[in-house]
Amino acid sequence: QPRLIEGLENVKDSFNSYPLDAVAQAVGSAALSDSAYYEETAKKITATRDKTIERLREMGFSVTDSKTNFIFAGKKGVDAADLKKFLEKNKIFVRHWDAPRISGYLRISVGTDEQMEILLSKIREYVSR
C-alpha cells in the first residue's frame, strides 16, 4: 500500500491544479466568516481589477470582461510569451498558454494597487521598446 499511496500523491495535483492545504482552508473559512472583511476585500479587488483593465485598454490591449480576480489580456503585435519572460525577469509572474486560440493572451492575477501599478509600468516599458 505505501507504493499505491506514493503513486496517488505523485499525481494528485494533475487532477486538481489548485490544491488547498489545511492551513489555506482554515484561512479561507475564517475570511468567509467575517462578512465585512470579505465585502471590503472584494470591493478593493474589483476596483483594482477594473482600473487595471481600463489602463490596459488605453495601451491598446484587448481585455476580456472579467468578474473574477484575474485579467485575460493580449495585444496584436505583442508576443505574449515574450512579454511573460520580460515580466518574469522583473519578478512579475503571469500565466501564458501555447494553445492557439489564447496564445496571444496573458492571465494576470489582480494584486494590490501598488503591484498593479508596477505591472502596468513594466508592460508600458515592454511595448514602447
Q: Where does each model-flagged region fall?
A:
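PLP-dependent aminotransferase class I/II
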Residues: 1-56, 62-64
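Phosphate- and divalent-cation-binding pockets in alpha/beta enzyme and binding domains
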Residues: 7, 27, 74, 82, ...
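Conserved PLP-binding catalytic core of the aspartate aminotransferase-like
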Residues: 45-46, 58-90, 106
